[in-house]
Amino acid sequence: MISILMQTLKIATRQSPLALWQAEHIRDRLQALYPELKVELVKFVTQGDKILDTPLAKIGGKGLFVKELEAALLDGRADLAVHSMKDVPMHLPEGLSLAVICEREDPLDAFVSNHVMSFDQLPLGARVGTSSLRRKCQILKQRPDLEIIDLRGNVGTRLAKLDDGQYDAIVLASAGLKRLGLISRIRHSINAEISLPAVGQGALGLECRANDKKILDLIAPLAHQPTSACVRAERAFNAYLEGGCQVPIAGFATLTQECLTLEGRVGSVDGKTLLKDHVEGHADQAEVLGVQLAKQLLAQGAGELLRDLYQ
């Protein structure tokens, strides 16, 4: 530990305001633990940041937001990468480890509008902005009359498009708005019954080289075991379904003492079909529960829904 404290820890991050907030948050937590630690943020513009005129589902999904950061870890330009867990692909490059999952912020989706308080108050045919097929599916299940329009860009860009009148409402992650001090923009948090969160939503993950014991030891105190169990269950569910980050799959786990409850949904993009199920079990069985739930939804026809999407 002493040797790393005498060096500079390099954290890879995207340049968006939210990504920088997340990296700075981890930097501050580490420096509170290790006051002698020097930290440098190494900033990258990823492919996901560059390609803003095409829906994510058509250009490779949210993995485009992490590839450059992972390359920097592998070639030694960075020691640590901070990710929003909902952006992290199910399979990591060889040699890297998702070593720490930090305590979760609000996992729910947020309804944001300048005119109305909720979906119920939106007029027929109102325009709702989101880049998420998961949100689109669940919104259309409730309100098939709404026009769901793709919405890309960082949080500030998305809010500016709403303020310009391009949308009647937009849906964003509550966690991002809260982290950026924009809680006043949230009209209300959307109940999970209406919009079940994305796998990993609201949690931060720390990725590093799998064999770098100094870094692994350094970041270990930031791990939050209850969040880790929940996110591991969610990711196992998604991985078994072979779902990327841009498919109409929702997975959300909660923990009460040692009992883990995992809810999952798979739907069609048009919202006409939405399969739901849940499992419960001991937190030690997080991944097993994720696979069990995936199998239950596959038995309901989830595989056919996802195959239709990939074709």
Curated annotation (Swiss-Prot):
Cofactor annotation: dipyrromethane
Modified residues (S-(dipyrrolylmethanemethyl)cysteine): C245
Biological process according to GO: protoporphyrinogen IX biosynthetic process
Gene3D superfamilies, per database record: Periplasmic binding protein-like II, Porphobilinogen deaminase, C-terminal domain
Cofactor: record remark: Binds 1 dipyrromethane group covalently.
PROSITE patterns xrefs: PORPHOBILINOGEN_DEAM
Cellular component terms (Gene Ontology): cytoplasm
Reactions it catalyzes: 4 porphobilinogen + H2O = hydroxymethylbilane + 4 NH4(+)
Pathway in which the depicted protein is active: Porphyrin-containing compound metabolism; protoporphyrin-IX biosynthesis; coproporphyrinogen-III from 5-aminolevulinate: step 2/4
Disulfide bonds: none
Keywords, ordered alphabetically: Porphyrin biosynthesis, Transferase
Molecular function as annotated in GO: hydroxymethylbilane synthase activity
Its EC number(s): 2.5.1.61
Function: Tetrapolymerization of the monopyrrole PBG into the hydroxymethylbilane pre-uroporphyrinogen in several discrete steps.
Subunit structure: Monomer.
Family indicated by similarity: Belongs to the HMBS family.
Remarks, miscellaneous: The porphobilinogen subunits are added to the dipyrromethane group.
This protein's name: Porphobilinogen deaminase
Native species: Acinetobacter baylyi (strain ATCC 33305 / BD413 / ADP1)
Gene name linked to the record: hemC
